[in-house]
């Protein structure tokens, strides 16, 4: 279920302060965040984020196509363990 349009998109206030400080200083240092629920705003385009996936931080470079999505969508929390196949099929 999506958020009500009357409320508007959510962004962590501390994250917005960090983004504004980075824009003002023209720095390219990645912004480390645990806020996976924050919506990507147009101000974020061109910035690097390190989004926590529960175990480590994943580098996310924000492009224009990502606007409106959540930061957590680009930092996968689960790794896919590939199913093993028969060894006889691999030998052929």
Curated annotation (Swiss-Prot):
Domain of life: Bacteria
PANTHER family: RIBOSOMAL PROTEIN S19P FAMILY MEMBER, SMALL RIBOSOMAL SUBUNIT PROTEIN US19M
Alphabetical UniProt keywords: Ribonucleoprotein, Ribosomal protein, RNA-binding, rRNA-binding
Organism, as annotated: Malacoplasma penetrans (strain HF-2) (Mycoplasma penetrans)
GO biological process: ribosomal small subunit assembly; translation
Alphabetical list of NCBIfam families matching this protein: rpsS_bact
Family: Belongs to the universal ribosomal protein uS19 family.
Cross-referenced SUPFAM superfamilies: Ribosomal protein S19
Lineage: Bacteria, Bacillati, Mycoplasmatota, Mycoplasmoidales, Mycoplasmoidaceae
Gene Ontology molecular functions: rRNA binding; structural constituent of ribosome
UniProt-recorded name of the protein: Small ribosomal subunit protein uS19
InterPro entries: Ribosomal_uS19, Ribosomal_uS19_bac-type, Ribosomal_uS19_CS, Ribosomal_uS19_SF
Record's function text: Protein S19 forms a complex with S13 that binds strongly to the 16S ribosomal RNA.
One GO cellular component term: small ribosomal subunit
Family matches, as PROSITE patterns: RIBOSOMAL_S19
Originating gene: rpsS
HAMAP family reported for this sequence: Ribosomal_uS19
């Amino acid at each position: 279920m999506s958020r009500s349009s009357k409320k508007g998109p959510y962004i962590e206030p501390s994250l917005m302060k960090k983004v504004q400080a980075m824009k003002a200083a023209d720095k390219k240092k990645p912004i480390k965040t645990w806020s996976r629920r924050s919506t990507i705003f147009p101000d974020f385009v061109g910035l690097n984020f390190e989004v926590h996936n529960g175990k480590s931080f994943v580098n996310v470079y924000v492009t224009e196509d990502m606007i409106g999505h959540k930061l957590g969508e680009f930092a996968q929390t689960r790794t896919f363990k590939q199913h093993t196949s028969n060894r006889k099929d691999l030998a052929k």
